[in-house]
């Protein structure tokens, strides 16, 4: 993980446009390729971000031409591909970071002055251990996939992927694959996790097209907005009601 504290300005160019004026911020570049811009507030929420898969390219800026317009990338110096470990760090005082995803959306960060630039190898994270209620909720939904939608059937619980297991993999009434992320309280982090799973599973020709479903006892408004914006279905589930539903699994005793 690379952590850069710098004076910077940020422009997002995509379906919408957004601008952050020049200020001191934290730039976070993770090993998975994601880049996020943070201020000293908003808890864990970034001001702007780009999720993987995306590429980060660094362009040195001519210091003697501060008023140059860089919106088309034509007035910058030689560019170099930037690895997430920061190994290709340029010696120029000012830089233009262009972060671009597969859809062509860009996060353009003009770094005016670096205060700190540090890279850490955090290694592989073991991930979160679900609490008792959340783990049981996942188990109950796997037993009763119809609670997620009429006609839903279970493919597999804890479906393995290279980036971790999908909580539940199902098929809807029309036979389409649906990846389900289960949370006790659904927040933005859960939506981001589901996004990564869906993007990865859609590369599998057998499973594609894969849709996403975000299931939780409670879904925060911001998380619901983000999930629906990404085309995911949101389902609020009643844990107590599910606990009282007889299991359809065959039991010996």
Curated annotation (Swiss-Prot):
By its UniProt entry, which InterPro entries does this protein fall under?
Endonuclease_NucS, NucS_C, NucS_N, NucS_N_sf, tRNA_endonuc-like_dom_sf
MF terms from GO for this chain are: DNA binding; single-stranded DNA endodeoxyribonuclease activity
EC number per UniProt:
3.1.-.-
Source species of the chain? Corynebacterium kroppenstedtii (strain DSM 44385 / JCM 11950 / CIP 105744 / CCUG 35717)
Please tell me whether the keyword DNA-binding is annotated for this protein.
Answer: yes
User: What HAMAP family is this protein classified in?
Assistant: NucS (MF_00722)
Coiled coil regions in record: none
Q: What does this protein do?
A: Cleaves both 3' and 5' ssDNA extremities of branched DNA structures.
Q: Which family does it belong to?
A: Belongs to the NucS endonuclease family.
What this protein is called in its record is Endonuclease NucS
- Where is this protein found? Cytoplasm
Q: Where is the composition biased (Polar residues)?
A: 71-87
Cited Pfam families? NucS_C, NucS_N
């Amino acid at each position: 993980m690379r952590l850069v504290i710098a004076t910077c300005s940020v422009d997002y160019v995509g379906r919408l446009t957004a601008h952050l004026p020049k200020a001191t911020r934290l730039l976070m570049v993770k090993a998975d390729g994601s880049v996020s811009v943070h201020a000293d507030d908003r808890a864990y929420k970034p001001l702007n971000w780009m999720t993987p898969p995306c590429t980060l390219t660094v362009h040195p800026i001519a210091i003697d031409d501060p008023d140059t317009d860089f919106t088309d990338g034509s007035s910058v110096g030689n560019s170099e591909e930037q690895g997430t470990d920061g190994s290709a760090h340029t010696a120029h005082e000012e830089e233009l970071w262009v972060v671009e995803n597969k859809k062509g959306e860009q996060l353009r960060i003009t770094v005016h002055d670096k205060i700190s630039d540090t890279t850490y190898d955090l290694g592989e994270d073991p991930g979160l251990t679900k609490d008792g209620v959340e783990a049981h909720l996942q188990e109950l939904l796997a037993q009763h996939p119809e609670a997620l939608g009429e006609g839903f059937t279970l493919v597999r619980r804890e479906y393995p992927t290279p980036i971790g297991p999908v909580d539940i993999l199902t098929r809807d009434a029309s036979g389409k694959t649906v990846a389900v992320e289960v949370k006790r309280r659904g927040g933005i982090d859960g939506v981001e996790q589901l996004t990564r799973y869906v993007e990865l599973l859609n590369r599998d020709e057998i499973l594609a097209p894969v849709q996403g479903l975000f299931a939780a006892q409670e879904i925060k408004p911001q998380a619901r907005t983000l999930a629906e914006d990404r085309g995911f279905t949101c389902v609020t589930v009643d844990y107590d009601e599910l606990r009282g539903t007889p299991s359809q699994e065959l039991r010996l005793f």
